Swiss-Prot record:
Source species taxonomy: Bacteria, Bacillati, Bacillota, Bacilli, Bacillales
GO terms, biological process: cobalamin biosynthetic process
Coiled coil spans: none
Domain GATase cobBQ-type: 251-443
Domain of life: Bacteria
UniProt protein name: Cobyric acid synthase
Amino acid sequence: MVKQIMIQGTASDAGKSVLVAGLCRLFKNKGKRVVPFKSQNMSLNSFITATGDEMGRAQVFQAEAAGVFPDVRMNPVLLKPTNDRQSQVIFMGAILDNMDAVTYHDFKQTLIPKIQAVYQSLADENDIIVLEGAGSPAEINLNDRDIVNMGMAKMVDAPVVLVADIDKGGVFASIYGTIMLLNEEERARIKGVIINKFRGDVALLQPGIDMIEELTNVPVIGVIPYANLQLEEEDSVSLNGKNYAPDSNALLDIAIICLPRISNFTDFHSLEIQPEISLRYIRNLADFGKPDLVIIPGSKNTLEDMAFLEESGLKKAIQNFAENAGKVIGICGGYQMLGQKMLDPDQVESKQLEIAGLGLLDTETIFLDQKRTTQITGVTHSGEAVEGYEIHMGETKRGESTSPFCKIKAVNGNEETHQDGAISANKNIIGTYIHGIFDNDVFLGNLFDELLTRKNQSIYPHEIINLKEHKEQEYDKLAALLEANIQMDQLEKIMKGEKICVSTQKPAIKE
């Protein structure tokens, strides 16, 4: 029979996704067949599986940590906000509809038997499932129809460990408040607490641990030290802490436009890990500076984000940068914005029917109801072999003054030839639908060399850090960190359904 453990958090960005990934790697290293599971994920960071199904990125990196291929069953429901009131609802990788919160709140009850069936299919194939909740289980206005926190735990009778982020402050209030806002049945499901991102001497924390255990009758089974691991971040909250000022000691200054509805910012993880590269996120005109490369990322509402560029003054700044021979790359929605105009006659993305683009590429995009979700391999205009994935609802046509950026050779593992993207005559402006383009080492190394040559400097002096290899190392570091700082014997008992009590054993931080 499958063992299971569910990680819930006191708030968003408490560390649930990373903790699940670490536990998956830990159990995988012990020879267990383990998979992650999150019944419902709200995120603009998504991935396309080998079968062309769309799922949340968090469950992808958790699957990588578990040593298995991403499977849409690990994240059956994906919600992609299109605006402040509506989300695109995706079930098992396929779009169902756009729904507002009230409509979806009523509708999601119909998904419960389907979610249970999906979960059971994973349970039949694995030894352990590590479940992840969303936000906080104490969203008491939503709990009557919850399908992702205590509602999911009840569906499959999973024990829960609550994780709280001490780095933000107020950790004991968040633990106590979360537990006490739950009803009696839900409180009984919480079998342990983990305090995350602790800095300092754990002895100073111990009086608080003793008090919170006494108040809640729930044992603290781990204190995880703050660790500077280079792992993907899925929650857009994490962007709030990203740099906006360039690093004067870096070889290259790369600026990403931080769109209000930015999607797939995981595209830039490969850039973040490279030595002597300054990666920063531009939110307003004052942050623009003098970058060596400007990247316009994907967007879940391209027309509205184009309007943001106009209103903020960033549109003119990007145009001026390009006119002065600056290098600009647009990914997916960013590619669409580089063109002359975007048309949305059926209001697929926005209430706007048409909007002018940046005018840096001779292209025009029309939005369609049909979403393209594929994994691809191809060859760029300069001969680099690349792979990645596409997620978009627009069709872009090139004019005569542009050339295709990439020749696609295979789609979802099947031979298929077509052209992707566009590149300007002077090669300075590139647009592509390929997410993950920067994860290709040769392409990235050549890009760095080009940017440095434009500055009359020698080529990039470092070997490109391969993202896949780098992540494998980070997953192992994470697993070791968790094993050293969680009372694994207590966690094993929880997973077996055995009762554990508040003990006198004190957690000790191990780096």
